[in-house]
């Protein structure tokens, strides 16, 4: 017998001496203890099967498990079809997760997240062979669910953990590497677009990624919403312009922007980025580890907008952790000595300093990198094209 529904109907139709608070308490207790299972259609996958209340929505067990795993492990899926795939269950997990939230009404807050007690393998494997590929190095980032004994931990591994960000230095660098790897795989950037509409689609796509990525940034829970909005601006700018430039260089692409159907201001800005940033990155020849570090430095440089002391503190923590992880990478996977490592990191830092030169005469030094000018020109362009900024 459905006690909860019968009691609710009797109270509503016949009245009761119980107060509204008492009724609410009874009904909440009913909702918490009820077992609602029936044969129906899952709101997510559309299959006819046994459905039940899971995390705020009536779905099948498979979609419930998919939603719980995605949220608890903080997985972010991305869709090539702008989250409009028709065959969600079989092909696109991004659309399946979006359907869980928007169609079924499932709530992330009802999922218990995994406790951060999982041990991870060391960031780098001891190997000084010069022919080791980047893909082999990245395998050292894969989490391990085993619990190594203290005897297997080296002295240099101790102390490489950020108490503020609650992550090891290596995992923080890994966070940025994963972003760069996805952008490289997509191979869509400002230098391969042919029309203004292509550019607007690229910006909107990167804005969506920035919105999703910001929520998973290490330490983002320590800053307020206004500063998170600023972080999104920096992240979107770095993805559209800086990351696109590096991806364009690393893939050895060659696309001319002459006679393309695009806005004049957009074409001029692309040419300016190509003649400054592209040249600077091609001279340094940054690999994926170095560029991921450079991107993290840029995102947290925080000079274009006024930010709080808390955000500056988190930014400094990111800089120190990523710098430490990058140094360990050089020591482990290259034959560079301490002096060469210092020089290399200095070159990357120098590029960052050129990025934020505030006073440069573009007429007399048109080939010198000036990101403040690029950032301001980008803001004006977005307003001109009607893009939110």
Swiss-Prot record:
It comes from the Eukaryota. It is found in: Nucleus. Keywords: DNA-binding, Metal-binding, Nucleus, Receptor, Transcription, Transcription regulation, Zinc, Zinc-finger. Transmembrane segments: none annotated. GO terms for molecular function: DNA-binding transcription factor activity; sequence-specific DNA binding; zinc ion binding. Residues 39-113 bind DNA. It holds the Pfam family zf-C4. The keyword Transcription applies. One of its GO terms (cellular component) is nucleus. Residues 157-388 form the NR LBD domain. Belongs to the nuclear hormone receptor family. This is Nuclear hormone receptor family member nhr-164.
């Amino acid at each position: 017998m459905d006690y909860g529904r019968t009691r609710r109907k009797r109270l509503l139709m016949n009245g009761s001496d119980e107060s509204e608070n008492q009724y609410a308490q009874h009904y909440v207790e009913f909702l918490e203890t009820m077992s609602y299972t029936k044969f129906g259609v899952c709101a997510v996958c559309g299959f006819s099967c046994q459905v039940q209340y899971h995390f705020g929505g009536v779905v099948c067990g498979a979609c419930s498990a998919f939603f719980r795993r995605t949220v608890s492990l903080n997985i972010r899926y991305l869709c090539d079809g702008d989250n409009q795939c028709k065959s969600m269950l079989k092909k696109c997990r991004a659309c399946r997760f979006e359907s869980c939230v928007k169609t079924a009404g499932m709530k992330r807050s009802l999922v218990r997240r995994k406790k951060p007690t999982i041990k991870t393998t060391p960031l780098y494997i001891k190997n000084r062979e010069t022919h080791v590929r980047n893909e082999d190095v990245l395998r050292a980032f894969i989490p391990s669910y085993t619990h190594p004994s203290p005897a297997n931990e080296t002295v240099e591994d101790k102390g490489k953990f950020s108490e503020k960000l609650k992550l090891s230095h290596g995992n923080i660098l890994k966070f940025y590497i994963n972003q760069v790897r996805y952008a490289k795989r997509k191979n869509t950037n400002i230098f391969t677009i042919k029309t203004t509409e292509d550019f607007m689609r690229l910006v909107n796509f990167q804005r969506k990624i920035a919105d999703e990525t910001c929520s998973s940034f290490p330490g983002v829970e320590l800053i307020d919403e206004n500063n998170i909005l600023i972080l999104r601006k920096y992240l979107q700018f770095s993805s559209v312009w800086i990351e696109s430039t590096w991806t364009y260089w690393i893939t050895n692409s060659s696309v001319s922007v002459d006679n393309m159907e695009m806005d004049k201001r957009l074409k001029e800005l692309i040419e300016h980025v190509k003649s400054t940033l592209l040249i600077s990155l091609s001279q340094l020849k940054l690999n994926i580890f170095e560029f991921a570090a450079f991107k993290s430095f840029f995102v947290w440089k925080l000079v274009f907008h006024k930010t709080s002391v808390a955000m500056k503190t988190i930014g400094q923590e990111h800089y120190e952790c990523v710098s430490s992880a990058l140094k360990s990478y050089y020591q482990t996977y290259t034959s560079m000595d301490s002096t060469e490592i210092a020089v290399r990191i200095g070159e990357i830092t120098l590029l960052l300093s050129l990025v934020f030169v505030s006073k440069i005469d573009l007429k007399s030094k048109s080939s010198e990198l000036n990101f403040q000018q690029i950032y301001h020109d980008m803001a004006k362009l977005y307003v001109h094209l009607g893009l939110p900024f």
